[in-house]
UniProtKB/Swiss-Prot annotation:
Name by which UniProt lists this protein: Probable mitochondrial adenine nucleotide transporter BTL2
Subcellular localization(s) per the UniProt record: Mitochondrion inner membrane
Originating species: Arabidopsis thaliana
Solcar repeat windows: 122-205, 215-300, 329-414
Membrane topology of the entry: Multi-pass membrane protein
An annotated GO BP: transmembrane transport
Length: 418
């Protein structure tokens, strides 16, 4: 409180001081009480006055007028308590803050939350674009090796790799090596975009839950597996259509739209999710191994004296460095670690890939499930049949993993992904 005024009133007093102007806004803005002296002890006023002694009271002249008179047969006093402007604002704000009711606070909160959400949405978009560009570059560059891989896994080629390559060049020309590449890019770009973005998102969430500053190896594997499952569920239909197009007779389906209509009309909507179970198993393992191995290698290097020195140098030079020099691992290590992670992933998941491709190629009513198909492949060709085409697949995966992770890391720097 900033001030305390006590106005005694006696009915026998003069008219100039015997009434209160009820229309005076300033008067009533201070607040007050009508008190009967017999019922109020002096200690009551002393206790209030002691709290108000640090500031001078505010006086509002002209309280007592003849215009409005309070009639009473007893003497009374009007207790007026007033606050100085500055302190009243401070005290009001303090009281409102305790109740979370500061004027404009909700608007500011909403503004801050809205800004965070917008930044988060923009960051997610940048993440997705970085992954998509990485997939487009790597897949287009390595399309010939991808085509050779499909010849072994889908058509069951047994001939030498060079013989198969010569056959494609002779019958279809050089463009034959890029057959199905557009669909492959359309399938892989969203898959990689979702995969990369989901991995970073899941890893950050696991860090928040655990309260750690750096992810453990277990958290890396879990985040990678979850990212692989997420991307598979969202993108499997495009992969199924692509497989149908490159198989024998696929040319007659009339492209992506024709293959889509054919599968829906003849086999139903769920035919687009052929091999979902082995795909999920394969991609969960693939994501866990790929991201886990890469991050373990990256973390191991960054904790070495050389790695710590590189981080310090990068921090000191800041924006003066170009995108390549701002790679934490540097260009060579980024490519090398990506290749190692890709090789480990391919060896671990290749049998699932073979089973999935064979499931997608099944026709007719008597269709095998994933487990039965696996045993069927082993019966026909033994364990090596599960790794048919592994060599061309590795030749394709090693540079693909290197390029995709390299381009992805560069795009994150260029797009300023947080």
């Amino acid at each position: 409180m900033s001030g305390l005024d006590i106005y005694p009133h006696d009915p026998s007093s003069s008219s100039s001081t015997s009434s209160i102007d009820l229309s005076n806004e300033a008067f009533f803005s201070t607040g007050g009480l009508f008190l009967e002296p017999p019922g109020v002890s002096s200690s009551f006023f002393d206790s209030i006055s002691s709290k108000c002694s640090d500031s001078e009271p505010l006086h509002f002249p002209g309280y007592w007028r003849n215009k409005t008179r309070l009639r009473s047969g007893k003497n009374f006093m009007f207790l007026s308590v007033s606050l100085s402007k500055d302190r009243s604002e401070q005290q009001c704000k303090k009281a409102l803050a305790q109740n979370d009711e500061i004027p404009g606070k909700d608007n500011r909160k909403r503004s801050v939350i809205g800004g965070v959400r917008r930044r988060g949405t923009m960051n997610t978009r940048k993440h997705l674009w970085a992954g998509a560009v990485a997939a487009m570059v790597s897949k287009t560059f390595l399309a010939p090796l991808e085509r050779l891989k499909l010849e072994y896994t889908v058509r069951g080629e047994q001939r030498n790799l060079l013989v198969v390559a010569k056959s494609i060049a002779t019958t279809q020309g050089l463009t034959g090596f890029w057959k199905g590449n557009l669909l492959n890019v359309l399938r892989t770009a969203p898959f990689k975009a979702v995969n990369f973005c989901a991995y970073d998102t899941y890893r950050k969430q696991l860090l928040k839950i655990a309260g750690n500053q750096e992810a453990t190896n277990f958290e890396r594997f879990v985040a990678g597996a979850a990212a692989g499952i997420t991307a598979t569920v969202l993108c499997l239909p495009l992969d199924t259509i692509r497989t149908k197009l490159v198989a024998r007779g696929g040319e007659a389906l009339g492209g992506i739209g024709g293959a889509f209509r054919y599968m829906i009309q003849t086999e139903g909507l769920f035919s687009l999710y052929k091999g979902l179970v082995p795909s999920i198993a394969s991609m969960a393992l693939s994501g866990a191994v790929f991201y886990g191995v890469y991050d373990i290698l990256k973390s191991s290097f960054l904790h070495t004296p050389e790695g710590r020195k590189r981080l310090i140098d990068m921090k000191q030079q800041g924006q003066e460095l170009n995108a390549l020099d701002r790679l934490e691992l540097g260009p060579i290590r980024t490519l090398m670690y990506g290749a190692i992670a890709g090789a480990c992933t391919e060896v671990a998941t290749y049998p699932f890939e073979v089973v999935r491709r064979q499931l997608q190629m099944q026709m007719g009513k008597n269709k095998l499930n994933a487990l039965a198909m696996g045993f069927n492949i082993i019966e026909r060709g033994g364990i090596p049949a599960l790794y048919a085409g592994l060599l061309p697949s590795l030749l394709q995966v090693l540079p693909s993993a290197s390029i995709s992770y390299f381009v992805y890391e560069c795009m994150k720097i260029v797009l300023k992904v947080e």
